[in-house]
Every structure is written in C-alpha cells, then in structure tokens.
C-alpha cells in the first residue's frame, strides 16, 4: 500500500499547486518509475487540490469570509498490486481519498463549516469523484 499526497497553497485568487505547468506522465516509484514524472494518481490528486482551492476561494469571496492563506492537501491510499496485476484481490485505484484544509482566517467555526460544505458542493472534481459518472472507453472519435 502506498500513500500518494498532493498539497497546494492558497495565494490571492489563485491556487498554486506543487505540480508542473507542463506535465509528463510516467510510472510512480512504487511501480518502477524514478520519481521524476507525475503518475496518474499524482495528477488526480493535483486536480482535486487545485479545484478545491479555487472553489474555496470563490465561495469565501461570495460569503465575504476573508482568507489570508492556507493549504489544501489531498492524500489517498493506493495498492499498486492491483494496477500491476500482482494481486487479483487488490483493487485498481484509490481505496480512499482525504481532502484537508488548513486556513489562515478569522472566520468563526460556523463560517468555516459553511465554507467547506459549499466548497464540497461546488468543486467539480470533488463531485465527479464522489458521484462516479458513467465512463466509457472507445476507439476513435468519442461522439455524443
């Protein structure tokens, strides 16, 4: 079992992620990669952190909650034996993903609770992961 973590910083109205602007995908070190490339699990968590950070900022602005800064962290449990085909019992993909926020704010606990509730509600990546949309594999043009 490996723990994959991504963390980004809240700065102004932007979200600065630890990822790279141009991303080259490769194998995770636990599957034979050298660690210099982003694995798909890294990119999934980076997308969640970025979306949650931007959404949190937008919701905070809408609710007039001042956020001076903070961090957004996503971490997930991934058993690489599944994706490597080593164990048929090991699932392919994350078993659990946890999203955490450390906020520098004078907001009340009630305001923070509302902020996080609405961030979950309006974060596209969070809702996509939570809802498990229909996903199809195809060859050629995906069409409608």
Give residue spans per PLM region:
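Classical protein tyrosine phosphatase
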Residues: 55
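Extended beta-strand/beta-hairpin segments
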Residues: 1-46, 58-144
């Amino acid at each position: 079992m490996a723990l994959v973590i991504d963390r980004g910083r809240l700065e102004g109205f932007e979200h600065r992620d630890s990822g790279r602007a141009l991303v080259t995908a490769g194998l995770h070190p636990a599957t034979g990669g050298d660690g210099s490339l982003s694995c798909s699990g890294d990119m999934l968590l980076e997308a969640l952190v970025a979306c949650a950070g931007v959404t949190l900022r937008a919701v905070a602005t809408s609710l007039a909650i001042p956020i001076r800064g903070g961090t957004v962290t996503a971490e997930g449990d991934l058993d690489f034996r599944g994706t490597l085909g080593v164990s048929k019992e090991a699932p392919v993909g994350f078993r659990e993903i946890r999203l955490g926020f450390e906020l520098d704010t004078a907001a009340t606990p009630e305001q923070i609770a509302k902020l996080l509730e609405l961030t979950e509600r309006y974060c596209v990546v969070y809702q996509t992961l939570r809802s498990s949309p229909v996903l199809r594999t195809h060859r050629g043009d995906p069409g409608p």
